[in-house]
Amino acid sequence: MAEQVFQNFETLQLHAGYTPDPHTRSTAVPIYATSSYTFNDSAHGARLFGLKELGNIYSRLMNPTVDVFEKRIAALEGGIAAAATSSGQAAQFLTIATLAKAGDNIVASSHLYGGTYNQLNVLLPRFGIKTKFVRSGKLEDYAAAIDDQTRAIYVESMSNPDYVVPDFEGIAKIAHEHGIPLVVDNTLGAGGYYIRPIEHGADIVVHSATKWIGGHGTTIGGVIVDSGRFNWNKHSERFPEMVEPSPSYHGLKYWEAFGPATFITRIRVEMLRDIGACLSPFSAQQLLLGIETLGLRAERHAQNTEKLAKYFESSPNVSWVLWPGSESHPTYAQAKKYLTRGFGAMLSIGVKGDASAGSKVVDGLKLVSNLANVGDAKSLAIHPWSTTHEQLSEDERLASGVTEDMIRISVGIEHVDDIIADFEQSFQKAYGS
């Protein structure tokens, strides 16, 4: 009888990527707190360093605890492999640095997290990599922005903080017609619970694992997932590093040696080796603990967010509500199509009053924390105009969907009545009603 293969999300989050430790039979994933690994002999070490054999060399490249985390996320997202990084920003940077070099560009939605926008708009140009931002979201505008030097299209599965859900299938089709991969930041997709972009044409998925994957605000981390579906050999003119002899490994040809895993292999053996933005085993263990309850948390997050959105829609102190599950949201049709397990765990509101009204409401909250994170089990709120997007110009903030009256809310798993009551009392202090 064939071995049963368990593929449901809630099962994978507990079991994928791990069998009991062979030395101790530990049912929990051990923390391998080591910098390096003993070789069987010199020949074994030489084979590992030459990539003729895969195995542990140094924890900057790989670590057994981190390996379980990588395999589990790859399973949850439907990819062939993953590489963990020190943060979500690191995951993003290493991905683009693997795809592009000086003189190249990427095409990206302008609806992005402020830190992402800064990395694309300010940091990467210092390395000679430019970004063409598409503000409209129209497929024809993505197509028009692509030229011979374009190396990827980059979007967020739900943009932060205005929750634009892109037309993944349409954008993927355009990317593939031009011989470039689609990269999706699926941080707000909660580790693949709300959406698995690979199922809709994405080639590479990145996450800030700090958020819903970890889920408790304890650990900074990132991860890159490779779908294994992009044919680098077919598009070798744009991506010669994927197929031509590598000077790092005595002429090794990645595509010839690793095939569909070419991209993620280069991330590991070049980018993690040279940049060093690796995840520690201690952080990996914390993130693995978070993953074990991811489905349960994500379900409650989505339920609470929907109830809170409906409360805000009826509040006299709120002028507008941005939530992808609302029929009034500009990309509601796409959200309904792609977000099949809930409309996420975030929303934004515009509060009535002058420019200081948003800050007053946030400052008046007692239960909901005012801080620069999302995806915590606890509810969080922030005024993006003066914090997360403060470093952008006014025009850039507006292009990113940030307005002066906006409050961004990451809805936690507390009882929703208590979350609502906290906003009620803050509104009372700010407006007297």
Swiss-Prot record:
EC number: 2.5.1.-
One GO BP annotation of this record: transsulfuration
Gene: FUB7
Similarity comment text for this entry: Belongs to the trans-sulfuration enzymes family.
Record lineage: Eukaryota, Fungi, Dikarya, Ascomycota, Pezizomycotina
InterPro entries: Cys/Met-Metab_PyrdxlP-dep_enz, Cys_met_metab_PP, OAc-hSer/O-AcSer_sulfhydrylase, PyrdxlP-dep_Trfase, PyrdxlP-dep_Trfase_major, PyrdxlP-dep_Trfase_small
UniProt xrefs under PANTHER family: HOMOCYSTEINE/CYSTEINE SYNTHASE, HOMOCYSTEINE_CYSTEINE SYNTHASE
Protein name (record): Sulfhydrylase FUB7
Highest taxon, organism lineage: Eukaryota
Function summary: Sulfhydrylase; part of the gene cluster that mediates the biosynthesis of fusaric acid, a mycotoxin with low to moderate toxicity to animals and humans, but with high phytotoxic properties. L-aspartate is suggested as fusaric acid amino acid precursor that is activated and further processed to O-acetyl-L-homoserine by cluster enzymes aspartate kinase FUB3 and homoserine O-acetyltransferase FUB5, as well as enzymes of the primary metabolism.
Keyword Acyltransferase belongs to the record: no
The entry's keywords: Pyridoxal phosphate, Transferase
Reported uses of this protein in biotechnology and industry: Fusaric acid is phytotoxic to plants such as cotton and banana. It has been shown to induce programmed cell death in plants. In addition to a mild toxicity to animals, fusaric acid exhibits acanthamoebicidal, antioomycete, and antimycobacterial activities.
NCBIfam families, per database record: OAH_OAS_sulfhy
